[in-house]
């Protein structure tokens, strides 16, 4: 038995029933759920190019165009059930073409192309649309953050480091930090889209074709910026996938940190963020509870999005530099789940940011009892009393410890400890009276004197808001240019394809 050639004795027929159910059916369903329009556009653009270059004559092109139109009219993709009669969605369309116009004419549509370049083009068409949808939502969030920051440019909050009260700043200043990160995240998406926006069509299997194809024309008709130059890269490179999901991963890692702060700031012990009733749920047993659970949902959805994007990168890891299924159908469909949860986060976070507010009484209480304006006392001693910062820091630290020990607050209970600490270290009396002391340690003064570039004082914040709105405007303008380009090329493709049918 060992001497029998398995190739000669093999009587099995494709597809194996287990393979059909575990691989082919999910791939077929993924294609019909996500890529029908992409297949349609690719077939039409390729056909127009074949006719324009003279590879196909007018009569043949017209027959194929008519058959493609008839398939659109008579087949509802959502109702298709995979039977195993054909390998995949591509071969289903080819089968339907053959049934309408015969094997010879139908087969000519596949001249100078392969499922390799078709597949990567499909995935790029799908990713471009999803990137555009997601970045539109990111721009809505960016606007919501800018609006909230401007509304709160003078609203005091406690800023934390290492989980402890550190210094006062404004909510507008804090949100502006998140704005700048989001701007960079959107820029990463823009760069990823530039990579996606290069057409693989015309690479065929690996090395292009001996036919006089026009790759740039197909790219243009499909709305791409240009063809991707190297044909091997067209079918082997996965950086369009890794760039996209890398951008998602980073955006939702960063947003997750903002969300975590919001969760902390709404806790009873901190309480500096107030969440309105419309975004609060109650307990089924504890009458006093106001649970801001949308923030919890934001946190886990951001983490899910991060995890899904990370999974896409993990799947690409250590794969061969060639065309391979690891980067294709099912993997691409899996990645779309990251876009779905990402969109939910962006929508909900934009709504939340527009509705939350700062509780000024809690902020004032937390500032007073935590002595977080004490840094300015040290700075003022350097400027007013000509001490070294280390001397000033020692005096300020002594004052803070005394106030905390008294369970008091710095403006009301800090002056007497300050007098003792100052004279004890310097051997002289201070020129700062109690009124001046109160001014120095007030949070309003703390913010006002931090007027350098990037600080929370009004002047640098006004400059910052102008810069942020400029960035938002630039993002909107670029998105509109892309939308106009895609629409114009879609219209041109429809016009050129329709013209083919006139030769019948």
UniProtKB/Swiss-Prot annotation:
Keyword Cytoplasm assigned to the entry: answer is: yes
Is the keyword Protein biosynthesis assigned to this protein? no
Q: Which UniProt keywords apply?
A: Amino-acid biosynthesis, Arginine biosynthesis, Cytoplasm, Lyase
Report the catalytic activity: 2-(N(omega)-L-arginino)succinate = fumarate + L-arginine
**Its annotated pathway?**
Amino-acid biosynthesis; L-arginine biosynthesis; L-arginine from L-ornithine and carbamoyl phosphate: step 3/3
| GO process annotations (BP) | arginine biosynthetic process via ornithine; L-arginine biosynthetic process
Its annotated compartments are: Cytoplasm
InterPro entries in UniProt: Arg_succ_lyase_C, Argininosuccinate_lyase, Fumarase/histidase_N, Fumarate_lyase_fam, Fumarate_lyase_N, L-Aspartase-like
- A GO cellular component annotation in the UniProt record: cytosol
Cite the EC number.
4.3.2.1
Q: What is this protein called?
A: Argininosuccinate lyase 2
């Amino acid at each position: 038995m060992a001497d029998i050639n398995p190739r000669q004795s093999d009587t099995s027929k494709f597809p194996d029933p287990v393979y059909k159910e575990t691989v082919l059916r999910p791939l077929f369903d993924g294609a019909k759920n996500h890529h029908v329009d992409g297949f349609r556009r690719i077939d039409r653009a390729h056909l127009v190019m074949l006719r324009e270059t003279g590879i196909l004559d007018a009569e043949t092109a017209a027959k194929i165009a008519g058959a493609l139109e008839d398939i659109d009219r008579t087949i509802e993709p959502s109702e298709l059930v995979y039977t195993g009669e054909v390998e995949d969605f591509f071969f289903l369309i080819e089968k339907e073409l053959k049934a309408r116009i015969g094997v010879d004419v139908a087969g000519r549509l596949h001249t100078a192309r392969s499922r390799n370049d078709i597949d990567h083009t499909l995935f790029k068409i799908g990713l471009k649309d999803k990137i555009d949808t997601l970045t539109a939502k990111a721009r809505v969030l960016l606007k919501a953050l800018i609006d909230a920051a401007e509304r709160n440019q003078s609203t005091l909050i406690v800023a934390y480091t290492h989980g402890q009260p550190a210094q006062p700043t404004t909510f507008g200043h804090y949100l502006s930090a998140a704005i700048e990160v989001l701007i960079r995240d959107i820029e990463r998406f823009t760069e990823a889209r530039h990579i996606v926006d290069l057409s693989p069509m015309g690479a065929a299997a690996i090395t292009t074709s001996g036919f006089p194809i026009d790759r740039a024309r197909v790219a243009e008709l499909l709305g791409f910026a240009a063809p991707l130059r190297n044909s091997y890269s067209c079918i082997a490179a996965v950086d369009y996938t890794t760039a996209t999901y890398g951008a998602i991963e980073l955006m939702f890692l960063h947003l997750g940190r903002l969300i975590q702060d919001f969760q902390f700031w709404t806790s009873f012990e901190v309480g500096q963020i107030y969440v309105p009733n419309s975004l609060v749920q109650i307990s089924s047993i504890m009458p006093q509870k106001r649970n801001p659970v949308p923030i919890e949902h934001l946190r886990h959805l951001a983490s899910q999005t991060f995890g899904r994007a990370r999974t896409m990168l993990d799947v690409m890891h250590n794969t061969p530099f060639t065309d391979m299924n690891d980067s294709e159908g099912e993997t691409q469909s899996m990645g779309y789940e990251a876009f779905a949860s990402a969109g939910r986060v962006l929508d909900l976070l934009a709504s939340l940011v527009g509705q939350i507010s700062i509780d000024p009484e809690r902020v004032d209480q937390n500032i007073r009892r935590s002595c977080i304006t004490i840094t300015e006392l040290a700075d003022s001693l350097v400027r007013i009393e000509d001490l070294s910062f280390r001397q000033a820091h020692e005096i300020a630290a002594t004052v803070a410890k005394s106030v905390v020990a008294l369970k008091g607050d710095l403006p009301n209970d800090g002056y007497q400890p300050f007098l003792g600490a100052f004279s004890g270290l310097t051997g002289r009396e201070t020129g700062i009276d109690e009124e001046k002391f109160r001014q120095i340690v007030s949070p309003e003064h703390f913010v006002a004197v931090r007027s350098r570039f990037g600080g929370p004082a009004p002047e640098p914040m006004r400059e910052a808001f102008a810069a942020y709105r400029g960035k938002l405007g630039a993002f909107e303008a670029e998105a509109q240019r892309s939308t106009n380009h895609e629409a114009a090329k879609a219209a041109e493709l429809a016009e050129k394809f329709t013209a083919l049918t006139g030769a019948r």
